[in-house]
């Protein structure tokens, strides 16, 4: 192996994709389940340069002949370069997190910063906060140690913090939807930054957005930025425009990983447009109504007849939760999916939501759609749901002409969203 990543579990890592998009060299993922495996790997030194992730960022320091002062102060190395058999250790997580904060306008000078978690990434984010002039840095733990000045989550809400950094795995795939901090009860918050990058928006970030926090951002750009700065050490040269490389690779990752969820009235064209989008983008198409039928074994009209709309909506929510946390899918949603806020959150956590807008007079009446029994029922339904579609959507796609025109409009909207 010339270049790669070592760590305990690497199944969900984006690092191979990032480095190969960035520099074109082969980059391998090398899971090392035990400490003995890691020590044997480091003793062999059969690599040019590697990244290091949990749980070996401290252990690797034992094998380094040189450790960058910043990495030594933080107590963790995530980048190792082999120079004629001598290992040189650096910490580009610091650079990646500093880039993330700067790129999104997170002001730290004079602020009170709240860091959730006490693991290794805590030290990295703390170093950035202090170096950028934070007035106070507070630590939050599920099991706080008063002697260390740590706060409970209940105490954190009353801390008066302006900035929150999450360094815990709370809300990380596949255990999404987890959040221990009540950001809605912290009216002075200016920024919430989560180092978790999968899903794109954790429950913490979604709640911060709901609470109107001016800056709420996940960790994808940090991941990319630390990789860009690691590659500079790998290759022994600087990129002409490192921030530009970060933007380019981040956009490419968003384009590859974010789901595309189509919402709108029954018969507005979600399924037809979804098939075309999936084919054009080379993605799997998931029709959520079909998944409900597969899971339940009954048709949608039969589910409505037996359990009513509430029974159907519960089954729908289960399928949206199932697929919403995955990546790289086109999701065709039922017309009423937006009626439950939990569904919208599940779609937005790792996806882009497109509202397929078709005039109510052009919608089909009857068929296998229990709530579309008449033109009047459709008009009433559209009036009730339209505000929900608009609130959920990242973009509105007019479907008043041909499907080809709607497809082109959807692609244009997606290009703008992914590159933003």
Predicted regions and their residues:
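Rossmann-like adenosine-cofactor binding region
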Residues: 148-216, 337-343
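Glycine-rich adenosine-cofactor-binding loop
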Residues: 7, 89-94, 101-102, 106, ...
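NTP-dependent small-molecule kinase module
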Residues: 244-255, 260, 276, 280, ...
């Amino acid at each position: 192996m010339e270049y790669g990543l070592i760590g305990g579990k690497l199944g969900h890592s984006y690092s191979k994709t990032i480095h190969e998009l960035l520099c074109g060299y082969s980059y391998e993922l090398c899971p090392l389940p035990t400490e003995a495996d890691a020590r044997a790997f480091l003793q062999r030194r059969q690599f040019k340069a590697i990244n290091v992730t949990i749980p070996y960022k401290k252990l690797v320091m034992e094998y380094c002949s040189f450790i960058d002062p910043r990495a030594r102060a933080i107590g963790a190395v995530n980048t190792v370069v082999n120079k004629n058999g001598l290992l040189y250790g650096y910490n580009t997580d610091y650079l990646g997190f500093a880039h993330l904060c700067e790129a999104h306008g997170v002001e730290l000078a004079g602020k009170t910063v709240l860091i959730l978690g006490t693991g290794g990434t805590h030290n990295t984010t703390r170093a950035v906060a202090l170096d950028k002039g934070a007035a106070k840095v507070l630590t939050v733990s599920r099991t706080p140690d008063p002697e260390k000045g740590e706060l409970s989550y209940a105490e954190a809400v009353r801390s008066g913090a302006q900035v929150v950094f999450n360094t815990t795995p709370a809300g990380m795939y596949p255990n999404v939807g987890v959040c221990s901090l009540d950001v809605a009860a912290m009216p002075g918050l200016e920024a919430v930054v989560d180092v978790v990058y999968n899903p794109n928006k954790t429950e913490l970030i979604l709640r911060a957005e709901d609470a109107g926090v001016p800056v709420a951002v996940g960790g994808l750009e940090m991941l990319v930025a630390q990789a860009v700065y690691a590659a500079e050490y790998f290759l022994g040269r600087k990129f002409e425009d490192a921030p530009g490389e970060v933007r380019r690779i981040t956009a490419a990752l968003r384009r590859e990983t974010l789901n595309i969820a189509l919402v709108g009235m029954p018969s507005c064209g979600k399924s037809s447009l979804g098939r075309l989008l999936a084919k054009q983008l080379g993605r799997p198409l998931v029709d959520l109504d079909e998944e409900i039928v597969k899971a339940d074994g009954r048709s949608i009209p039969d589910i409505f007849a037996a359990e009513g709309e509430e029974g159907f909506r519960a089954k729908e929510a289960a399928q949206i939760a199932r697929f919403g946390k995955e990546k790289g899918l086109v999701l065709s949603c039922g017309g009423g999916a937006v009626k439950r806020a939990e569904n919208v959150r599940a779609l937005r956590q790792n996806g882009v939501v497109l509202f397929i807008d078709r005039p109510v007079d052009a919608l089909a009446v009857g068929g296998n759609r229990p709530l579309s029994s008449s033109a009047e029922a459709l008009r009433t339904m559209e009036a009730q749901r339209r505000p929900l579609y608009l609130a959920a959507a990242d973009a509105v796609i007019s479907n008043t002409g041909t499907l080809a025109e709607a497809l082109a409009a959807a692609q244009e909207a997606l290009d703008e969203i992914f590159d933003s």
